[in-house]
């Protein structure tokens, strides 16, 4: 029998409780994952009581309130607050999403917040995105065209060709989809994952790019592409409503067509 043991410092323990100092009109408890690698201690779940009557409507508003008024050491990423930049991607109430567009009212009971799953944690709710970005760089996500550029205009495309990019270019690389994918959890060192494969197809589908063959050859690998088993977590969790699984399927179809299948 195989015995699997977690490292001793991986067990999440109960952390500090920050109780309300005064009566609240709309009290709500927020439970947040805390981890600081510099302390060489187990991660914990800290509990904070906040007044929703004095807090904005989104989960990110609650985190900002906690950081500003209760515990300034709480660490998380955020920027646009409009679901555009992808900085505040995290696991909220068991689902990967963006804290800035997740309404508190959609959550019943305690608000439970963790970093994106199966990624190294820099601190608290901040995941290490370096491997994810390296995978993105590996697909060469820029227009590649070996023909001379037009002298008096940009490289143009028809309205119909432009529409082929809808549902692809909107990806904000938040990694919600990839970190919800069990195949990426198991083979993330080699499998590119839903987000990167959707981005790869974005350039394959672009009529202005003439490196389609080379791009497909680069993806034709048992691990890079074919670890996708259509589990569909990626499509379900995408905060932009995109369909990475569909894009992956199209890449597989194009490769099959190249081999006459």
From Swiss-Prot:
> Coiled-coil region(s) at which residues?
none
Q: What's its catalytic activity?
A: a quinone + succinate = fumarate + a quinol
Q: Which domain of life is it from?
A: Bacteria
- The residues the record assigns to binding a ubiquinone are 186
Q: Which UniProt keywords apply?
A: 2Fe-2S, 3Fe-4S, 4Fe-4S, Electron transport, Iron, Iron-sulfur, Metal-binding, Oxidoreductase, Transport, Tricarboxylic acid cycle
Using the record's annotation, list all stretches that form the 4Fe-4S ferredoxin-type domain.
161-191
Where [4Fe-4S] cluster binds, per the record, is at 171, 174, 177, 238
Sequence ranges assigned to domain 2Fe-2S ferredoxin-type in this UniProt record: 28-119
Q: What GO annotations for molecular function exist for this entry?
A: 2 iron, 2 sulfur cluster binding; 3 iron, 4 sulfur cluster binding; 4 iron, 4 sulfur cluster binding; electron transfer activity; metal ion binding; succinate dehydrogenase (quinone) activity
Q: Which residues bind [3Fe-4S] cluster?
A: 181, 228, 234
Q: Give the pathway.
A: Carbohydrate metabolism; tricarboxylic acid cycle; fumarate from succinate (bacterial route): step 1/1
Which cofactors is this protein said to need? [2Fe-2S] cluster; [3Fe-4S] cluster; [4Fe-4S] cluster
EC annotation? Answer: 1.3.5.1
Its GO biological process annotations read: respiratory electron transport chain; tricarboxylic acid cycle
Say which enzyme class the record assigns.
oxidoreductase
State the Pfam families in the record: Fer2_3, Fer4_17
Per the entry, the cofactor note is: Binds 1 [2Fe-2S] cluster. Binds 1 [3Fe-4S] cluster.
Asked if the Swiss-Prot or TrEMBL record annotates the protein with the keyword Protein biosynthesis, the reply is no
Fetch the NCBIfam families from UniProt. Answer: dhsB, PRK05950.1
State how it assembles: Part of an enzyme complex containing four subunits: a flavoprotein, an iron-sulfur, cytochrome b-556, and a hydrophobic anchor protein.
Family of this protein: Belongs to the succinate dehydrogenase/fumarate reductase iron-sulfur protein family.
Question: What name appears for this protein in its UniProt entry?
Answer: Succinate dehydrogenase iron-sulfur subunit
Gene designation: sdhB
